[in-house]
Amino acid sequence: MNRRNFMKASGVLALGALTSCQVVKDDKKPEREVYELQIHTLSENGMLLKDYLRDSFIPAMNRLGARVGVFSSFKNDEDNRLWILTVYEDMCHYKKCKDGIWEDEVYRSSAQGFFDKTSTGSASQATEIYLMESISPDYRFIAPGADRTLKEIRIYRSPNEEGHKRKVEMFRDDEAQIFTDTDMGVAFYGKVLSGPITPTIIYMPSFADEEIRDAKWKEFGPKYSPIKNLEKYRNNMERVVSNDYVRSLPFSHF
């Protein structure tokens, strides 16, 4: 393909993507929210990342209409991971923010110091990124109350795509309602579109303290058992990839 035809084809693809976003907005149909979870294992320059998030990234995302939560380990001071959860209205909003942040001169100016300082020594030893969409347009992000200081980030893996589909349906049609009835304070349910481990689903319950957490999970168990054993939901989960207890940092949106 010559350059002219390539550019023409690229333009058509770009226009198609833009048009699809416009159609979504024009039709005013509810879209699934999109979530991005980054898990950073901090290096000795880790404080630079926290400063960048507080002073540059979060204000820029706020100007673009996105919400950002930043979390560290709830109790383990030796755990040097940092969790960053960004909430977008839909996939079009996600794309708008990813592109728009680089057009924000305030952000570019504010963040340049971070980019300069980490150009020869990253703030993270490793980074995992999960891109998700809500399990249903009906399930929207609910920011945990300020009193819910203990949060869990739970990642479940299914054995295959068919099992994953049934696990998502289980959450959407039955399990999420049990969480609501048990007052587990779940902020979001995310079906993973891409990430280091798939097929997976991620969700975040929240509690006032560990004692309440234990009591709520104990209450949840008997309500969950009847649906867990339904034929349509059998063998839809392989393992718990991780279950991390986290707390919000002072500059986190939630």
Which residues does each predicted region cover?
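N-terminal export signals
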Residues: N5-V24
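Extracellular/periplasmic catalytic domains that process cell-envelope and extracellular macromolecules
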Residues: N76-E78, G121-S124, G145-T149, G195-I197, ...
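Short, well-ordered beta-strand segments in beta-rich or mixed alpha/beta enzyme
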Residues: Y35-T41, G69-W102, L150-S158, G190-V192, ...
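An amphipathic, aromatic/His-enriched active-site/gating alpha helix that lines ligand/cofactor pockets
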Residues: M7-L13, K29-R32, M47, D51-G69, ...
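Surface-exposed interaction/gating patches
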Residues: S134-A208
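C-terminal segment of N-terminal export signals and the immediately downstream linker at the start
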Residues: C21-I39
